Amino acid sequence: MFVGPHRCFLISLIVYTLTVTTSSARLILEDTTVRSEEDSGPSCPVLADEPVGEVMERICDMCHELSSHSRPNMRVECRADCFTTDAFRECLKLFTPRRHTRHLRQKY
């Protein structure tokens, strides 16, 4: 089918494509979040429960992405004191459905 330089070129192209695709996927899947010792240490029991801790971390990350232009330290503020700050509550409000918020207000 392909002989000589064409075959080498095709093999090189396939290897290059696989390498680029794999490295791009790795960049997307890797967690690039840097956690400070005070937020993720043993003093924060919330993070011991991995699914809950992961959701809380993600809320802070997404909130930071939305508000980093006005509050550049939002990620740190949100995670401070083991997610008990007003900044975390503000972020949580952003991602709480309106209907649920209305239900909570009526209930309490």
Swiss-Prot record:
Keywords: Disulfide bond. Coiled coil: none annotated. Disulfide bonds join C44-C82, C60-C78, C63-C91. It comes from the Eukaryota. One of its GO terms (cellular component) is extracellular region. Belongs to the arthropod CHH/MIH/GIH/VIH hormone family. This is Uncharacterized protein ZC168.2. It comes from Caenorhabditis elegans.
